Amino acid sequence: MVSRLRCFIGGILFCFFTSSFALHATENDDLVKAMMEVYAEELAANPQDYRTYYSRAMAYFGQGDMKKALSDIDNAIKYFPRKEKDDLAQAYLLRAKILSERGETKSALTDLNSALRLVPNHRLALKDRGDLLCQLGQYDMAKIDYNHLLRMDTRSQSAFMGLARVEAHTGQPVRAKDLLAQAVNLSPKDPKIYLERSEIYKEMDMMPEAVDDLVYAVSLDDGHSGAIQKLVAYSNESYNGVIEGLNRNIERSPRQGMLYYVRATIYKDHYDYASSLRDWNTIVEENFFNFHTVYYNRAFCLSRLTRFDEARADIKRAIEKDSQNAEYYRLLSEIERGDGNLAAAEQAVRQAAVYDPSNVAICLERGMIAYDEGDFGQAISCYNEAVIAAPDEPYSYLARAYTQEYGMENRIAAEADYRKVLSLDGTSAAYGNNLKGIAFARLHLKKQAEEWERSLLASGSVRNIDYFYLACMYAGFDVDKSISYLDKALQNGYGDYYRIHVDCYSPVSLLPIRHLSQYSDLLYKYRALFGK
C-alpha cells in the first residue's frame, strides 16, 4: 500500500515540481507533507532505495531546499545500479541543476558530462550543458552541443535559442536576431518563448525589444507565464526603459487592462504613487478588473499621498472582498493613524494581529500608535517584538532608538540601538537599505556617515529612495546637503509625500528641515509628483 501511494504521489509531484509553480511549493502544503512522510517511511524500510532518494531530491529541489536536495541526490547516485543508464543519467542531470543553483558550476558541468557519457544523445543534457558552457563563456564548446541538438531535431527551439545566445555574446547581433526569430516562429503563440527571447535581447542591451516581448507574453496569457515578474525585475535595472516600453504598448493597445496593472505596480514599487494612482483609477473606471488587490493598491497610493478619506474607502472595499488579510487591516490602521483616528487605528491593527501576530510591519504599526498616544513604554515593547520577529531589519532598531531618545530620554539605550544597526550584516541587495549612514549620523560619527554616503553612491544602482535616505542622514547636521539630496530624490521620482512631509517615528525622517523655506519651495516645485 505504501509503495503504491508513493508511486501515486510521486507521479503527481513530478508534474507539480516541473511546473512553473515549482519554486512556490512549501512544506506546509498538505500534499508535500504526505509525500515527505511516505518517503521517510520508504527510506526507513530500505535505506538504499535510490528511487526514493531521487524522488525526494526532486521534491526538495522544487521547494528550493538545495542542501537537502543535494544530500538525497548524492545518495541516489551512490546506490543507483550502473546498468540503469537512462535513469542514472537523469539523476546526474538533477544533481547538475542543484549544483548550478548553488553556484557550483564546475561540478555541475562534470555531472552533465557524466550524463552524456551514459546517454550521448540525451537532449536535455545537451541543452543544459550548452547553457552552462555559455554561462561559463565557453561559446565554441556550447555551439557544438547546440548544433548536435539541431542535427537531432531541426525544429529544436532550445538549439536555436542557444545558438542565438552564442552569436549574441560573440559579436554577431544580426545572426543572433535571425536565430531568435526562427525560434519564435516555431511556436508564435507560446508566451514562454517570448520570455526566453527577452532575456537574450536584454543581454544584447536591446531593452525596447526585451520589454516588447514580455508585454506580448502578458497579452497572450495575462502574465501567468511569469512575464509580469520579469518586467518588474527588469524595471529595477532599467526603470525608464521598462516604463517607456509599457507606455508604447499601452498606446497601441489601450484596452489591455493587464498592461495598466503592470505599469501601476512598477510605478508603486518605485515610489511614484501619483502615477501609479492614475493607472489604478483607469483600471477601476474602465472596469478592467474588480480584484481586491486593485483597491488595496489604490488605497496604498492614496495613503502615501495623504488622501486618507479616499484611501479608507478603498481599503474597506478590499477588506469586504478579502476579510482575513492581515496587510489590509494593517494599512487601514496606518490610514486611521495618519488621519488622527488613533482608536480606529488601534482596532484595525488588533484585527491585523489576529491573522499575523508576528508580522514586523504590524508590530511597527502598533508601536507608532503607542508613540502617538504618548505611551512610550508600550511603543518600545512593540518595537521589541518587531526586533524579535526580524532581528536583521534595521528600521525596527532605529524606531526603538528614537523612542528611547525622545520619548524616554534614555540616550544610552538609544545609542546601543544605533550601534546595533552598524553591526548588522545587511542582507538586502540594495546597499541603502542597511540605513547605517543614519545610525552614524545619530552617533555623531560624521566621517563614517560621509564614507557610507560615498559607498552608497558608488554601489552601482542608486535609487530615488537612496537620495531620500541621504537627505534624512544629513537633516540633523548639514541642512544644505539634506536639501540637495531631497531635490535629487524628487527629481528622480520619489513621490512618498507621507514619508517626506509627515513621518516622524524614527531618524529616517526629514523633521529637522521641514520648517525651512527651501524645503517648502522644493515641495511646491515638485507638487505634480504628489498629485497636487
Predicted ranges, named:
Residues 45, 79-83, 118, 152, ...:
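Structural marker of alpha-solenoid helical repeat scaffolds
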Residues 50-51, 84-85, 89-90, 123-124, ...:
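Helix-start (N-cap) detector for alpha-helical repeat units in TPR-like alpha-solenoids
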Residues 55, 87-90, 94, 128, ...:
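Canonical tetratricopeptide repeat
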Residues 61, 93, 100, 127, ...:
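Position-specific recognition of the canonical hydrophobic site in helix A of tetratricopeptide repeat
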Residues 240, 250-258, 262, 388, ...:
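Alpha-helical protein-protein interaction modules
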